[in-house]
């Protein structure tokens, strides 16, 4: 039987130990996984909100060009 490359290759071994064979307790519930997904969504929304806020102009004469710039270039 050939050794598993996932457990013998140095780089794949590091990825395997941290992501695939996760060193986590076996009694983690589905709520823990759901909460981590919610945290990822929250961080994504905060980062995209900050990105859009940096490209927004509140001046009435520049408002349309600001939205057009956001739709075109961001």
UniProtKB/Swiss-Prot annotation:
It comes from the Eukaryota. It is found in: Mitochondrion inner membrane. The chain crosses the membrane at residues 34-54. InterPro entries: Cyt_b/b6_N (IPR005797), Cytb/b6-like_sf (IPR027387), Di-haem_cyt_TM (IPR016174). Its cofactor is heme. Its main location: mitochondrion. GO terms for cellular component: mitochondrial inner membrane. It is a multi-pass membrane protein. Keywords: Electron transport, Heme, Iron, Membrane, Metal-binding, Mitochondrion, Mitochondrion inner membrane, Respiratory chain, Transmembrane, Transmembrane helix, Transport, Ubiquinone. Binds 2 heme groups non-covalently. GO terms for biological process: mitochondrial electron transport, ubiquinol to cytochrome c. The cytochrome bc1 complex contains 11 subunits: 3 respiratory subunits (MT-CYB, CYC1 and UQCRFS1), 2 core proteins (UQCRC1 and UQCRC2) and 6 low-molecular weight proteins (UQCRH/QCR6, UQCRB/QCR7, UQCRQ/QCR8, UQCR10/QCR9, UQCR11/QCR10 and a cleavage product of UQCRFS1). This cytochrome bc1 complex then forms a dimer. Heme 1 (or BL or b562) is low-potential and absorbs at about 562 nm, and heme 2 (or BH or b566) is high-potential and absorbs at about 566 nm. Component of the ubiquinol-cytochrome c reductase complex (complex III or cytochrome b-c1 complex) that is part of the mitochondrial respiratory chain. The b-c1 complex mediates electron transfer from ubiquinol to cytochrome c. Contributes to the generation of a proton gradient across the mitochondrial membrane that is then used for ATP synthesis. Belongs to the cytochrome b family. This is Cytochrome b. It comes from Anser caerulescens.
